[in-house]
Amino acid sequence: MVTDNIADMLTRIRNANMVKHEIVEIPGTKMSKAIAEILKEEGFIENFETYTENSNQYLLLSLKYEGQSRERIINKIERVSKPGLRVYANSKTLPLVLNGLGIAIISTSKGVMTNRKAKSLGIGGEVLCYIW
């Protein structure tokens, strides 16, 4: 049984990315769907779709690579806020990942969004992960 669905999702993406798999299957939750939507908008994955099997919902993420040598788009993906140690930031202290080259995914009162969008709206929240 998985206690941290976000860490499980990020680990599955990281492992599939390391061996250059095209598709990775992730248990579907509202949070994982919101994170997948952000990854698609920011260009880290090609696409994602949901399907249901035996009343369990799953996400299929299509990972993205570039060039003939299939260079990875996602260089690093790491969990920041964990169940044992939550990390919060207000709008003034939102993290800048790799001087703006990467993104931080933030869970706010207005939903899950990137650090750039949260800063433009002037809201803070829980820092879920960094991706670059």
From Swiss-Prot:
Annotated GO biological processes are: translation
UniProt protein name? Small ribosomal subunit protein uS8c
Quaternary structure?
Part of the 30S ribosomal subunit.
What GO CC annotations are associated with the protein? chloroplast; ribonucleoprotein complex; ribosome
Where, per UniProt, does this protein localize? Plastid, Chloroplast
The species this protein belongs to is Thalassiosira pseudonana
Instruction: Tell me the lineage of the source organism.
Output: Eukaryota, Sar, Stramenopiles, Ochrophyta, Bacillariophyta
InterPro entries linked: Ribosomal_uS8 (IPR000630), Ribosomal_uS8_CS (IPR047863), Ribosomal_uS8_sf (IPR035987)
Q: Which residues form a coiled coil?
A: none
Q: Per UniProt, which keywords does this protein have?
A: Chloroplast, Plastid, Ribonucleoprotein, Ribosomal protein, RNA-binding, rRNA-binding
Q: Name one GO molecular function term.
A: structural constituent of ribosome
Q: Which SUPFAM superfamilies match?
A: Ribosomal protein S8
Q: Which Pfam families match?
A: Ribosomal_S8 (PF00410)
Transmembrane domains' residue ranges:
none
What the entry lists under NCBIfam families is as follows: PRK00136.1 (NF001109)
Q: What does this protein do?
A: One of the primary rRNA binding proteins, it binds directly to 16S rRNA central domain where it helps coordinate assembly of the platform of the 30S subunit.
Name the family.
Belongs to the universal ribosomal protein uS8 family.
